[in-house]
Protein backbone atom coordinates (compact mmCIF):
# COMPACT_ATOMS: atom_id res chain seq x y z
CA UNK A 1 0.00 0.00 0.00
CA UNK A 2 1.41 3.35 -1.04
CA UNK A 3 1.47 6.18 1.47
CA UNK A 4 1.20 9.95 1.17
CA UNK A 5 1.45 12.80 3.65
CA UNK A 6 -0.73 15.80 2.83
CA UNK A 7 0.39 19.01 4.53
CA UNK A 8 -2.38 21.57 4.93
CA UNK A 9 -3.91 23.70 7.65
CA UNK A 10 -4.97 27.07 8.90
CA UNK A 11 -7.74 27.82 6.42
CA UNK A 12 -10.47 25.91 4.61
CA UNK A 13 -8.94 27.09 1.34
CA UNK A 14 -5.95 24.82 1.98
CA UNK A 15 -7.76 22.00 3.75
CA UNK A 16 -10.76 21.19 1.56
CA UNK A 17 -8.82 20.81 -1.72
CA UNK A 18 -6.44 18.52 0.16
CA UNK A 19 -9.35 16.44 1.42
CA UNK A 20 -10.73 15.98 -2.10
CA UNK A 21 -7.33 14.71 -3.24
CA UNK A 22 -7.17 12.46 -0.17
CA UNK A 23 -10.56 10.91 -0.94
CA UNK A 24 -9.51 10.18 -4.51
CA UNK A 25 -6.31 8.47 -3.38
CA UNK A 26 -8.06 6.48 -0.66
CA UNK A 27 -10.47 5.16 -3.30
CA UNK A 28 -7.42 3.92 -5.21
CA UNK A 29 -6.04 2.08 -2.19
CA UNK A 30 -3.63 4.66 -0.80
CA UNK A 31 -2.99 5.22 2.89
CA UNK A 32 -3.28 8.95 3.57
CA UNK A 33 -1.69 10.79 6.49
CA UNK A 34 -2.13 14.48 7.29
CA UNK A 35 0.36 16.95 8.72
CA UNK A 36 -1.16 19.94 10.50
CA UNK A 37 -1.31 21.81 13.80
CA UNK A 38 -3.44 20.95 16.80
CA UNK A 39 -4.57 24.56 17.32
CA UNK A 40 -6.17 25.12 13.91
CA UNK A 41 -9.33 23.87 12.22
CA UNK A 42 -7.67 20.92 10.48
CA UNK A 43 -7.54 19.21 13.88
CA UNK A 44 -11.35 19.23 13.94
CA UNK A 45 -12.09 18.66 10.24
CA UNK A 46 -9.59 16.04 9.04
CA UNK A 47 -10.30 13.25 11.60
CA UNK A 48 -13.97 13.27 10.53
CA UNK A 49 -12.81 11.79 7.21
CA UNK A 50 -11.05 8.87 8.89
CA UNK A 51 -7.61 10.28 8.08
CA UNK A 52 -4.75 9.99 10.58
CA UNK A 53 -3.44 13.46 11.41
CA UNK A 54 -0.05 14.23 12.92
CA UNK A 55 0.79 17.55 14.54
CA UNK A 56 3.73 19.93 14.56
CA UNK A 57 4.06 23.24 16.41
CA UNK A 58 4.29 26.08 13.91
CA UNK A 59 2.54 29.39 13.26
CA UNK A 60 2.48 32.03 10.53
CA UNK A 61 4.41 35.28 10.39
CA UNK A 62 1.56 37.71 9.69
CA UNK A 63 0.62 40.00 12.55
CA UNK A 64 3.67 39.10 14.64
CA UNK A 65 5.56 41.67 16.69
CA UNK A 66 9.34 42.01 16.53
CA UNK A 67 9.99 39.66 19.46
CA UNK A 68 7.77 36.97 17.92
CA UNK A 69 9.45 37.36 14.53
CA UNK A 70 12.88 36.92 16.13
CA UNK A 71 11.70 33.62 17.64
CA UNK A 72 10.51 32.18 14.32
CA UNK A 73 13.86 30.58 13.26
CA UNK A 74 14.02 28.66 16.54
CA UNK A 75 10.40 27.55 16.25
CA UNK A 76 11.03 26.47 12.66
CA UNK A 77 13.94 24.29 13.78
CA UNK A 78 11.71 22.62 16.38
CA UNK A 79 8.92 22.13 13.83
CA UNK A 80 11.39 20.63 11.34
CA UNK A 81 12.58 18.17 14.00
CA UNK A 82 8.97 17.19 14.71
CA UNK A 83 8.28 16.79 10.98
CA UNK A 84 11.44 14.69 10.62
CA UNK A 85 10.25 12.23 13.27
CA UNK A 86 6.81 11.98 11.64
CA UNK A 87 8.22 11.43 8.13
CA UNK A 88 10.73 8.85 9.40
CA UNK A 89 7.94 6.95 11.16
CA UNK A 90 5.47 6.99 8.24
CA UNK A 91 8.06 6.66 5.43
CA UNK A 92 5.70 8.05 2.76
CA UNK A 93 6.12 7.44 -0.96
CA UNK A 94 5.36 11.11 -1.66
CA UNK A 95 4.55 14.33 0.21
CA UNK A 96 2.01 16.92 -0.95
CA UNK A 97 2.00 20.51 0.31
CA UNK A 98 -1.19 22.52 -0.12
CA UNK A 99 0.31 25.86 0.91
CA UNK A 100 0.39 27.68 4.23
CA UNK A 101 3.05 27.77 6.91
CA UNK A 102 2.36 24.22 8.13
CA UNK A 103 3.76 22.82 4.88
CA UNK A 104 7.18 24.44 5.22
CA UNK A 105 8.85 22.17 7.85
CA UNK A 106 7.64 18.99 6.17
CA UNK A 107 8.68 20.34 2.79
CA UNK A 108 12.18 21.07 4.01
CA UNK A 109 12.56 17.60 5.54
CA UNK A 110 11.17 15.88 2.45
CA UNK A 111 13.85 17.59 0.38
CA UNK A 112 16.64 16.69 2.80
CA UNK A 113 15.44 13.05 2.88
CA UNK A 114 15.01 13.00 -0.92
CA UNK A 115 11.31 12.19 -0.70
CA UNK A 116 9.27 13.28 -3.74
CA UNK A 117 7.67 16.63 -2.88
CA UNK A 118 4.86 18.22 -4.86
CA UNK A 119 2.82 21.31 -4.07
CA UNK A 120 -0.54 22.73 -5.08
CA UNK A 121 -1.17 26.49 -5.19
CA UNK A 122 -4.85 27.47 -5.09
CA UNK A 123 -4.47 31.22 -5.72
CA UNK A 124 -3.40 33.18 -8.78
CA UNK A 125 -0.67 34.83 -6.66
CA UNK A 126 1.40 32.16 -4.92
CA UNK A 127 1.75 32.26 -1.15
CA UNK A 128 5.09 32.56 0.62
CA UNK A 129 5.26 28.87 1.61
CA UNK A 130 4.72 27.60 -1.92
CA UNK A 131 7.13 30.16 -3.37
CA UNK A 132 9.79 28.79 -1.04
CA UNK A 133 9.03 25.10 -1.55
CA UNK A 134 8.67 25.38 -5.34
CA UNK A 135 12.47 25.40 -5.58
CA UNK A 136 12.70 21.90 -4.07
CA UNK A 137 9.77 20.10 -5.68
CA UNK A 138 9.33 17.39 -8.28
CA UNK A 139 6.18 19.05 -9.64
CA UNK A 140 4.50 22.41 -8.91
CA UNK A 141 0.74 22.18 -9.45
CA UNK A 142 -1.17 25.43 -9.84
CA UNK A 143 -4.85 26.31 -10.17
CA UNK A 144 -4.14 29.24 -12.51
CA UNK A 145 -1.68 29.41 -15.39
CA UNK A 146 1.58 31.33 -14.91
CA UNK A 147 1.38 31.41 -11.12
CA UNK A 148 4.63 29.58 -10.39
CA UNK A 149 6.97 30.30 -13.28
CA UNK A 150 9.15 27.20 -13.46
CA UNK A 151 9.58 24.38 -15.96
CA UNK A 152 8.14 22.03 -13.31
CA UNK A 153 4.76 23.82 -13.15
CA UNK A 154 1.52 22.24 -14.36
CA UNK A 155 -1.87 23.97 -14.41
CA UNK A 156 -4.43 21.60 -12.89
CA UNK A 157 -7.19 23.84 -11.48
CA UNK A 158 -8.59 23.58 -7.97
CA UNK A 159 -10.01 20.30 -6.60
CA UNK A 160 -13.77 20.80 -6.16
CA UNK A 161 -16.26 19.02 -3.93
CA UNK A 162 -18.56 16.45 -5.55
CA UNK A 163 -21.56 18.42 -4.26
CA UNK A 164 -20.37 21.21 -6.58
CA UNK A 165 -19.43 19.10 -9.59
CA UNK A 166 -22.80 17.31 -9.45
CA UNK A 167 -24.78 20.55 -9.85
CA UNK A 168 -26.71 21.09 -13.08
CA UNK A 169 -25.41 23.63 -15.56
CA UNK A 170 -26.48 27.13 -14.62
CA UNK A 171 -28.66 27.75 -17.68
CA UNK A 172 -30.49 24.48 -16.96
CA UNK A 173 -31.03 25.74 -13.42
CA UNK A 174 -32.54 29.14 -14.12
CA UNK A 175 -33.29 29.52 -17.83
CA UNK A 176 -37.04 29.12 -17.28
CA UNK A 177 -37.23 31.10 -14.04
CA UNK A 178 -39.37 34.19 -13.73
CA UNK A 179 -39.89 36.84 -11.08
CA UNK A 180 -37.28 38.80 -9.13
CA UNK A 181 -33.58 38.11 -9.63
CA UNK A 182 -32.23 35.76 -6.97
CA UNK A 183 -29.10 37.26 -5.46
CA UNK A 184 -26.85 35.30 -3.11
CA UNK A 185 -24.65 37.47 -0.87
CA UNK A 186 -21.80 35.62 0.83
CA UNK A 187 -19.14 37.29 2.92
CA UNK A 188 -17.29 34.20 4.07
CA UNK A 189 -18.06 32.19 7.20
CA UNK A 190 -17.48 35.28 9.35
CA UNK A 191 -19.63 37.52 7.17
CA UNK A 192 -18.38 40.78 5.68
CA UNK A 193 -19.39 43.95 7.45
CA UNK A 194 -19.41 46.13 4.33
CA UNK A 195 -21.92 43.68 2.83
CA UNK A 196 -23.94 43.53 6.03
CA UNK A 197 -24.52 47.27 6.24
CA UNK A 198 -24.94 47.79 2.50
CA UNK A 199 -27.52 45.22 1.43
CA UNK A 200 -30.35 46.19 3.80
CA UNK A 201 -30.22 49.57 2.01
CA UNK A 202 -30.12 47.85 -1.39
CA UNK A 203 -33.22 45.87 -0.40
CA UNK A 204 -34.93 49.09 0.68
CA UNK A 205 -34.40 50.68 -2.75
CA UNK A 206 -35.00 47.69 -5.04
CA UNK A 207 -37.72 46.10 -2.90
CA UNK A 208 -39.48 43.24 -4.71
CA UNK A 209 -37.35 43.53 -7.84
CA UNK A 210 -34.83 41.18 -6.18
CA UNK A 211 -34.72 38.24 -3.78
CA UNK A 212 -31.79 38.26 -1.37
CA UNK A 213 -30.23 35.32 0.43
CA UNK A 214 -27.57 36.85 2.66
CA UNK A 215 -24.99 35.05 4.79
CA UNK A 216 -24.20 37.63 7.45
CA UNK A 217 -21.83 35.77 9.80
CA UNK A 218 -22.14 35.71 13.58
CA UNK A 219 -21.26 39.34 14.35
CA UNK A 220 -23.98 41.95 14.89
CA UNK A 221 -26.76 39.49 14.03
CA UNK A 222 -29.47 41.44 15.83
CA UNK A 223 -28.37 44.76 14.31
CA UNK A 224 -28.41 43.34 10.77
CA UNK A 225 -31.84 41.80 11.34
CA UNK A 226 -33.17 45.19 12.45
CA UNK A 227 -31.60 46.94 9.46
CA UNK A 228 -33.39 44.55 7.13
CA UNK A 229 -36.68 44.82 8.98
CA UNK A 230 -36.82 48.63 9.00
CA UNK A 231 -38.83 49.91 6.02
CA UNK A 232 -38.32 46.70 4.04
CA UNK A 233 -41.87 45.33 4.06
CA UNK A 234 -41.81 44.85 0.27
CA UNK A 235 -38.33 43.35 0.09
CA UNK A 236 -37.92 39.58 -0.23
CA UNK A 237 -34.94 38.36 1.74
CA UNK A 238 -33.53 35.50 3.77
CA UNK A 239 -30.67 36.11 6.18
CA UNK A 240 -28.63 33.48 7.96
CA UNK A 241 -25.38 33.48 10.00
CA UNK A 242 -23.91 30.64 7.95
CA UNK A 243 -24.98 28.63 4.90
CA UNK A 244 -24.22 24.99 5.67
CA UNK A 245 -25.13 23.70 2.21
CA UNK A 246 -23.51 26.12 -0.22
CA UNK A 247 -24.40 23.86 -3.16
CA UNK A 248 -28.08 24.41 -2.42
CA UNK A 249 -27.49 28.17 -2.30
CA UNK A 250 -25.60 28.09 -5.61
CA UNK A 251 -28.46 26.12 -7.17
CA UNK A 252 -30.99 28.72 -5.94
CA UNK A 253 -29.08 31.80 -7.11
CA UNK A 254 -29.06 33.71 -10.40
CA UNK A 255 -26.14 35.88 -9.25
CA UNK A 256 -23.64 35.80 -6.40
CA UNK A 257 -21.96 38.77 -4.71
CA UNK A 258 -18.94 37.66 -2.71
CA UNK A 259 -15.23 37.83 -1.96
CA UNK A 260 -12.83 36.16 -4.40
CA UNK A 261 -11.16 33.36 -2.49
CA UNK A 262 -9.56 30.79 -4.78
CA UNK A 263 -12.04 27.96 -4.15
CA UNK A 264 -15.05 30.26 -4.41
CA UNK A 265 -13.83 31.54 -7.77
CA UNK A 266 -13.22 28.01 -9.08
CA UNK A 267 -16.62 26.79 -7.88
CA UNK A 268 -18.39 29.75 -9.47
CA UNK A 269 -16.57 29.20 -12.75
CA UNK A 270 -17.30 25.47 -12.78
CA UNK A 271 -21.04 25.73 -12.15
CA UNK A 272 -21.45 28.87 -14.26
CA UNK A 273 -22.81 31.26 -11.65
CA UNK A 274 -22.45 34.94 -12.67
CA UNK A 275 -20.69 36.94 -9.98
CA UNK A 276 -19.92 40.37 -8.66
CA UNK A 277 -16.63 40.01 -6.80
CA UNK A 278 -15.48 42.37 -4.06
CA UNK A 279 -11.89 41.21 -3.47
CA UNK A 280 -10.54 41.42 0.06
CA UNK A 281 -7.79 44.09 0.00
CA UNK A 282 -4.81 41.89 0.80
CA UNK A 283 -1.40 43.47 0.30
CA UNK A 284 -0.64 41.25 -2.71
CA UNK A 285 -4.20 41.65 -4.11
CA UNK A 286 -4.38 37.90 -4.75
CA UNK A 287 -8.18 37.88 -4.58
CA UNK A 288 -8.35 40.48 -7.35
CA UNK A 289 -6.11 38.34 -9.53
CA UNK A 290 -8.17 35.23 -8.70
CA UNK A 291 -11.27 36.98 -10.07
CA UNK A 292 -9.61 38.78 -12.98
CA UNK A 293 -9.75 35.88 -15.51
CA UNK A 294 -13.52 35.54 -14.94
CA UNK A 295 -13.98 39.24 -15.53
CA UNK A 296 -11.98 39.06 -18.75
CA UNK A 297 -14.16 36.30 -20.24
CA UNK A 298 -17.30 38.28 -19.41
CA UNK A 299 -18.58 36.01 -16.65
CA UNK A 300 -18.09 38.32 -13.67
CA UNK A 301 -17.67 41.91 -12.56
CA UNK A 302 -15.20 43.24 -9.99
CA UNK A 303 -15.75 46.08 -7.53
CA UNK A 304 -12.73 47.06 -5.47
CA UNK A 305 -13.58 47.50 -1.79
CA UNK A 306 -12.78 51.22 -1.78
CA UNK A 307 -15.38 51.75 -4.53
CA UNK A 308 -18.01 49.48 -3.00
CA UNK A 309 -21.17 51.30 -1.90
CA UNK A 310 -24.96 51.11 -2.14
CA UNK A 311 -25.25 53.24 -5.27
CA UNK A 312 -22.67 51.22 -7.21
CA UNK A 313 -24.44 47.94 -6.38
CA UNK A 314 -27.89 49.31 -7.21
CA UNK A 315 -26.68 50.61 -10.58
CA UNK A 316 -25.14 47.24 -11.44
CA UNK A 317 -28.22 45.26 -10.41
CA UNK A 318 -30.58 47.52 -12.35
CA UNK A 319 -28.59 46.78 -15.50
CA UNK A 320 -28.80 43.00 -15.12
CA UNK A 321 -31.52 40.57 -16.17
CA UNK A 322 -31.72 36.81 -16.58
CA UNK A 323 -30.96 36.93 -20.28
CA UNK A 324 -27.67 38.75 -19.59
CA UNK A 325 -26.91 36.41 -16.70
CA UNK A 326 -27.43 33.30 -18.84
CA UNK A 327 -24.88 34.64 -21.33
CA UNK A 328 -22.42 35.26 -18.47
CA UNK A 329 -23.11 31.79 -17.06
CA UNK A 330 -22.34 30.05 -20.36
CA UNK A 331 -19.08 31.97 -20.71
CA UNK A 332 -18.02 30.83 -17.24
CA UNK A 333 -18.93 27.17 -17.62
CA UNK A 334 -17.48 26.79 -21.11
CA UNK A 335 -14.16 28.22 -19.91
CA UNK A 336 -13.67 25.55 -17.21
CA UNK A 337 -12.00 22.60 -18.91
CA UNK A 338 -9.96 21.03 -16.12
CA UNK A 339 -10.64 17.80 -14.23
CA UNK A 340 -8.45 18.73 -11.31
CA UNK A 341 -8.82 15.73 -9.01
CA UNK A 342 -8.30 13.21 -11.81
CA UNK A 343 -5.23 15.09 -13.07
CA UNK A 344 -3.65 15.46 -9.62
CA UNK A 345 -4.28 11.82 -8.76
CA UNK A 346 -2.62 10.74 -12.01
CA UNK A 347 0.40 12.99 -11.36
CA UNK A 348 0.86 11.45 -7.90
CA UNK A 349 0.52 7.91 -9.28
CA UNK A 350 2.99 8.58 -12.10
CA UNK A 351 5.63 10.00 -9.74
CA UNK A 352 5.38 6.99 -7.41
CA UNK A 353 4.99 4.34 -10.13
Curated annotation (Swiss-Prot):
Sorted alphabetically, the Gene Ontology BP terms of this entry are: carbohydrate metabolic process; cell division; cell wall organization; lipid glycosylation; peptidoglycan biosynthetic process; regulation of cell shape
Q: How does it sit in the membrane?
A: Peripheral membrane protein
Q: Give its localization.
A: Cell membrane
Involved pathway(s): Cell wall biogenesis; peptidoglycan biosynthesis
Annotated GO molecular function terms are: UDP-N-acetyl-D-glucosamine:N-acetylmuramoyl-L-alanyl-D-glutamyl-meso-2,6-diaminopimelyl-D-alanyl-D-alanine-diphosphoundecaprenol 4-beta-N-acetylglucosaminlytransferase activity; undecaprenyldiphospho-muramoylpentapeptide beta-N-acetylglucosaminyltransferase activity
Quote the EC number: 2.4.1.227
Q: Which reaction does it catalyse?
A: di-trans,octa-cis-undecaprenyl diphospho-N-acetyl-alpha-D-muramoyl-L-alanyl-D-glutamyl-meso-2,6-diaminopimeloyl-D-alanyl-D-alanine + UDP-N-acetyl-alpha-D-glucosamine = di-trans,octa-cis-undecaprenyl diphospho-[N-acetyl-alpha-D-glucosaminyl-(1->4)]-N-acetyl-alpha-D-muramoyl-L-alanyl-D-glutamyl-meso-2,6-diaminopimeloyl-D-alanyl-D-alanine + UDP + H(+)
Q: Identify the residues that bind UDP-N-acetyl-alpha-D-glucosamine.
A: 123, 161, 189, 243, 262-267, 287
Keyword Translocase listed: no
| GO CC annotation, single | plasma membrane
Keywords associated with the record: Cell cycle, Cell division, Cell membrane, Cell shape, Cell wall biogenesis/degradation, Glycosyltransferase, Membrane, Peptidoglycan synthesis, Transferase
Return the Pfam families for the record.
Glyco_tran_28_C (PF04101), Glyco_transf_28 (PF03033)
Gene3D superfamilies for the chain: Glycogen Phosphorylase B
Family annotation (NCBIfam families): murG (TIGR01133)
Can you tell me which family this protein belongs to? Belongs to the glycosyltransferase 28 family. MurG subfamily.
Quote the PANTHER family the UniProt record gives. GLYCOSYLTRANSFERASE, UDP-N-ACETYLGLUCOSAMINE--N-ACETYLMURAMYL-(PENTAPEPTIDE) PYROPHOSPHORYL-UNDECAPRENOL N-ACETYLGLUCOSAMINE TRANSFERASE 1
Q: What does this protein do?
A: Cell wall formation. Catalyzes the transfer of a GlcNAc subunit on undecaprenyl-pyrophosphoryl-MurNAc-pentapeptide (lipid intermediate I) to form undecaprenyl-pyrophosphoryl-MurNAc-(pentapeptide)GlcNAc (lipid intermediate II).
The name of this protein is: UDP-N-acetylglucosamine--N-acetylmuramyl-(pentapeptide) pyrophosphoryl-undecaprenol N-acetylglucosamine transferase
Q: What is the lineage of its organism?
A: Bacteria, Pseudomonadati, Pseudomonadota, Gammaproteobacteria, Enterobacterales
Amino acid sequence: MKKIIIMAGGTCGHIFPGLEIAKSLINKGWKVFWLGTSKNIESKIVPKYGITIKYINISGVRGKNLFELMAIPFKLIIACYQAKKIIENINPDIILGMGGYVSVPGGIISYLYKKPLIIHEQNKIAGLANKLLSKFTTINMQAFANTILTSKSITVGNPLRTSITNLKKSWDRFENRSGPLRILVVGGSQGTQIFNFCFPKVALVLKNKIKLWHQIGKKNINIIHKLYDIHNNLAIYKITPFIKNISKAYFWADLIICRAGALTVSEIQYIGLPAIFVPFPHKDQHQYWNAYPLKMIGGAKIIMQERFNVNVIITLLKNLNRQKLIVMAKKLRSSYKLNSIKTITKIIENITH
